[in-house]
């Protein structure tokens, strides 16, 4: 299975680099602290609804797109890191 792609990587590769945007410039334009954008770009912070709305407005992309990327990433990462352990430990409830 391929490694899940963090939305921050998509932000950098598909939006920031083509437009020549730095972390500081994007943070200023979004009216957020630069460390928020830095953490997203570095894959250590999730995209929240607030950030999704800001990114969506700025790049003319729906906020749901940004949230969808995060919602796709989170379970894939969890499955990769702890999936077999979770499946092994959780008791399945029988169907009624």
Task: Describe these PLM feature segments.
Residues 21-39:
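Short alpha-helical DNA-recognition segment
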């Amino acid at each position: 299975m391929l490694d899940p792609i963090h939305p921050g990587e998509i932000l950098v590769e598909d939006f920031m680099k083509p437009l020549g945007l730095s972390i500081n410039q994007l943070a200023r334009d979004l009216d957020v602290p630069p460390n928020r954008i830095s953490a997203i770009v570095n894959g250590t912070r999730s995209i929240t609804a607030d950030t999704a709305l800001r990114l969506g407005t700025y790049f003319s992309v729906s906020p749901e797109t940004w949230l969808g990327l995060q919602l796709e990433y989170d379970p894939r990462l969890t499955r990769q890191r702890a999936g077999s352990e979770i499946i092994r430990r959780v008791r399945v409830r029988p169907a009624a």
